[in-house]
């Protein structure tokens, strides 16, 4: 997934956006460090999609209510044999990030880190040195 043997030249951190409360969402402001590396609309679309997925994970509905009831009735042992709605959506997030890295970010010398690996505090984007510059071409 990581660009092969390219040294890290920096990291960018996309902070959480608390303007709408404490729900998990990240700022869509385009960081200057990514200028000339990735299209602004593509970056914003990635962050918006992640925000929508996290909103879906936190949404309370019939399934979440049923999971809670089953958990209470089984002394939470039900979670040994089934995934919660939240866990299923987190898997979707991981898959989406992996796809974005493969299709969009890695070819540009960038790597998105799953926010769950940073405690849902930030989206970390690692910037690798431009291969063309490092190989002397």
UniProtKB/Swiss-Prot annotation:
GO terms for cellular component: extracellular exosome; extracellular region; Golgi membrane; Golgi stack; palmitoyltransferase complex; tertiary granule lumen. Its main location: Golgi. Changing residue 69 to A: Strongly reduces palmitoylation. Abolishes palmitoylation and Golgi localization. Changing residue 24 to A: Slightly reduces palmitoylation. Keywords: Golgi apparatus, Lipoprotein, Membrane, Palmitate. Expressed in all tissues except colon and thymus. One of its GO terms (biological process) is peptidyl-L-cysteine S-palmitoylation. Transmembrane segments: none annotated. Pfam families: Erf4. Palmitoylated on Cys-69 and Cys-72; which is required for Golgi localization and interaction with GOLGA3. A lipid is attached at residues 69, 72 (S-palmitoyl cysteine). It is a lipid-anchor. The keyword Cell membrane does not apply. The keyword Acetylation does not apply. Interacts with GOLGA3. Interacts with ZDHHC9. May be involved in protein transport from Golgi to cell surface. The ZDHHC9-GOLGA7 complex is a palmitoyltransferase specific for HRAS and NRAS. Belongs to the ERF4 family. This is Golgin subfamily A member 7. The gene is GOLGA7.
